[in-house]
């Protein structure tokens, strides 16, 4: 038609975690995948995708009563946090189906208060829903080629757009 193509892009990936180490006491060390501020880790519930399915765990660090007074309110780096899945040793972690390299995500939660929705990764879902609605409304009303792109790897870099730009 001679009209330039138009692409609408929204990302659909999420931040997450990967198991870095499982210690003898059954505590799991993780690395972050994506831009996760460490100040929000303690007490967060995670789901790890293991060989036997999903395993729930909670991010933890040193107990408050065992932490020196000068350290009690400091934000701990992820290297000083652990995922507790209720295992007493590494063999119990293995029986749960977890191993180094397995991925984890924040446990999903959502609720509605009045006309406000609270949810994980709502920006991703809202972007994709908006593009879908917009394309439905303009279908057949333009001569240019329209593309909807649901990208991944946005949480890690701009790599998500490289294949799109090449196309």
Q: Residues of each region from the PLM?
A:
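N-terminal hydrophobic/helix-forming segments and targeting peptides
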Residues: 1-167
């Amino acid at each position: 038609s001679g009209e330039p193509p138009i692409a609408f892009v929204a990302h659909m990936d999420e931040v997450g975690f990967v198991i870095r180490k499982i210690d003898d006491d059954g505590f799991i060390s993780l690395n972050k995948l994506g831009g996760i501020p460490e100040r929000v880790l303690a007490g967060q519930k995670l789901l790890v995708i293991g060989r036997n399915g999903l395993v729930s765990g909670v991010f933890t660090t040193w107990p408050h009563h065992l932490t020196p007074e000068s350290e009690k309110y400091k934000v701990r780096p992820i290297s000083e946090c652990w995922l507790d899945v209720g295992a007493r040793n590494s063999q119990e972690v293995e029986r749960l189906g977890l191993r180094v390299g397995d991925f984890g995500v924040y446990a999903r939660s959502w609720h509605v208060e009045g006309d406000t929705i609270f949810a994980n990764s709502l920006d991703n879902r809202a972007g994709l829903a908006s593009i879908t609605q917009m394309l439905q409304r303009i279908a057949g009303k333009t001569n240019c080629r329209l593309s909807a792109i649901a990208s991944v790897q946005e949480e890690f870099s701009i790599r998500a757009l490289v294949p799109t730009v090449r196309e």
